[in-house]
Amino acid sequence: MKSSPNQLSIFSYLLGICSLDTLLSPVGRKMDAISPLVILRMDNHISSFFSEFQPNGQAPISSTDKQVTPQVSHDGQVLEFAPPRRLKTEEIPNIVDDFRIAARNAIEAGFDGVEIHGANGYLIDQFMKDSVNDRTDAYGGGIENRCRFAAEVITAVAGEIGAHRLGVRLSPFADYMDCHDSDPEVLALRVIGLMNNLGVLYCHMIEPRMCVGAGEDGSKPVIAHGRLLPFRKAFRGTFMVNGGYDRDEGDKAVADGYADLVAYGRLFLANPDLPERFRRKAGLNKYDRSTFYTSDPVVGYTDYPFLDDQNSELATR
């Protein structure tokens, strides 16, 4: 199952995924990335609340059967969500195995690592957070039970590909798709404890306050460092932060020891050579939010210019 149309899957399409890895790996090396590492983000492939994206129009699965509250998109469109189907207890091991198989396929395709997406209202988040999880079986109730699915997925993937190839993304403070928790600090520390025991390579955590990116409306993002510091101190591996950072804020986070790495999303989407632009302190392309999550293979994805292309164009004018 998919959470959006035209979403890339890695259950059987290994030849296409191999081609993607072959294409992307030299780019990482050319831009002097931290390592020639191409991370396959393991999005929750079965969390969609849009039944039209599911095989034969079947209901999307979840920890619950509660329907997501209608939401207004950035363009003013009201999104109605299909009622999900609550997973039966006996079905859950098969879902855990889906994550394991996808991770194995990623490594066989040539990727160096896998990131499990346990954030932003996807399936793992739906199990962990008490605003959604209303189960009465071994996967619901107290925090240990609510984290059981996450623990099983992380353990299975680590056992399949090695914890040294594995990262986990968490958003304890976020409220996506009605997913929020009454005690996010305790929840995140619980998962981090599991990750420490397994020796997971990195923890990728989203800031509690998603800031407006620089260049979107002329404002400069201001990030109140500190909310993620307890998790940074608790996690024994590499700690990565994300959420509205620009170059200066990212440098500060690393220099202050607040994080080991800073992840960029929207800025990277609009600037395919973002590391080089940061290195030169060059200007950035402005991203176009209206093209986010579209199915067009070019517009909004591969049509943003490289810095050298822009300089060459200016030189010929």
Curated annotation (Swiss-Prot):
Signal peptide: none annotated. The active site is at residue 122. Substrate binds at residues 117-120, 209. Pfam families: Oxidored_FMN (PF00724). GO terms for biological process: fatty acid biosynthetic process; oxylipin biosynthetic process. Its cofactor is FMN. FMN binds at residues 26-28, 169, 244, 265-266. InterPro entries: Aldolase_TIM (IPR013785), OxRdtase_FMN_N (IPR001155), Oye-like (IPR045247). Disulfide bonds: none annotated. Gene3D superfamilies: Aldolase class I (3.20.20.70). One of its GO terms (molecular function) is oxidoreductase activity. Keywords: Fatty acid biosynthesis, Fatty acid metabolism, Flavoprotein, FMN, Lipid biosynthesis, Lipid metabolism, NADP, Oxidoreductase, Oxylipin biosynthesis. It is an enzyme of class 1 (oxidoreductase). Its EC number is 1.3.1.-. Belongs to the NADH:flavin oxidoreductase/NADH oxidase family. Putative oxophytodienoate reductase that may be involved in the biosynthesis or metabolism of oxylipin signaling molecules. This is Putative 12-oxophytodienoate reductase 10. The gene is OPR10.
